[in-house]
Amino acid sequence: MALAARWEAHAPCAPPQAHKTQKRGVKAISVKKIIGPLAVYAAACVGYGRCTGDVLGYGLAWNMALALLPLVLQQAMRRCRPRAGRGALGLVWLLLLPNTFYMVTDLIHVPPQMEWVEALADGTVAVRHSALLREWALLLLLGVGAFFAALLGCRALAGLEECLPAAWPAPARQAAVAGVCLLCGIGIYLGRFLRFNSWDVLHPVQLARSVLGSASAFSALFVLMMALGIFGMYRFYRHMAR
C-alpha cells in the first residue's frame, strides 16, 4: 500500500536528486501510443481464430487485453488523488501484473511438427519444414504476443522502481523488484498449471487449498525459474532503454 500511495507522475514522484536519475531511466509510455499496435495484434488473433476455427486465437487476444491492464492501472494511479484509491488500484495492479509475463508461457502452443529430418534413399538426410501456412501464422502470433506482453510487463516494473522511495539504496530497490518478480512467478504457476485467474483471489480458501495441495519441488523450481527469467528480462529492458 505504501508503494502504491507514492505512485504519481514522474515530476512529483521523487525529489530533485532522484529525478536526475530518472532522466536516464525509462520514458513513460502512453496507452494511446501503444493501443494501435496491440489492437492490430488482437485483430490478427481473432482473424486467425475465425479462419482456422482454432479458439487459441481468441485466447491470445484476451490474454493481450489482460496484459495491457497493468499499464492502464499504472496511469490511473498517477491521476488518483486519494491515497486509499491509489492503494486499492495498486493492489489490483499487483494481482494483474503476472498476466503480462504469462503470455511467454503461451509458447507451449507452438505446433509440434514445424521441422523434421527425413532420411533419403541415397543415405543422406534432408531437413523438412511444415508447408501449412496456419502453423507459421500461429508461430508468429505466439512470438509477437510474448514479445509485446513482456515489454508491457517490463514497463510496469519500471514504473514500480521509479516510484520507490528515493532514499532507498539501490540494493533495496532491486530487492523490491525481485520480490514482485517472484510474485509474478507464483501467479504464472497458478494460471498455467492450476488454471486460476487473477480474480480467484476472491476465493482465498479454495486458492490456498489448491496451492498447498500442488506444492512440490517442481512447482518451487518453476516459480524460481520464472522469477529469475522475468528479473533478467527486466534488467535487460532497463539497460537497453537508457
Predicted regions and their residues:
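Short, hydrophobic transmembrane alpha-helix segments
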Residues: G47-Y58, M77-R81
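Transmembrane alpha-helical segments in integral membrane proteins
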Residues: L142-P165, M225-R242
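Membrane-interface helix-boundary motifs at transmembrane edges
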Residues: A76-A88, E162-A172
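Membrane-interface interhelical connector segments
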Residues: I108-E135
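N-terminal membrane topogenic signal
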Residues: R24-P37, A172
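Central hydrophobic cores of alpha-helical transmembrane segments in multi-pass inner-membrane proteins
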Residues: N63-R79
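Membrane-interface transmembrane-helix boundary segments in multi-pass integral membrane proteins
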Residues: L56-A61, L207-I230
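Hydrophobic alpha-helical membrane-insertion segments
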Residues: L89-V104, A176-G191
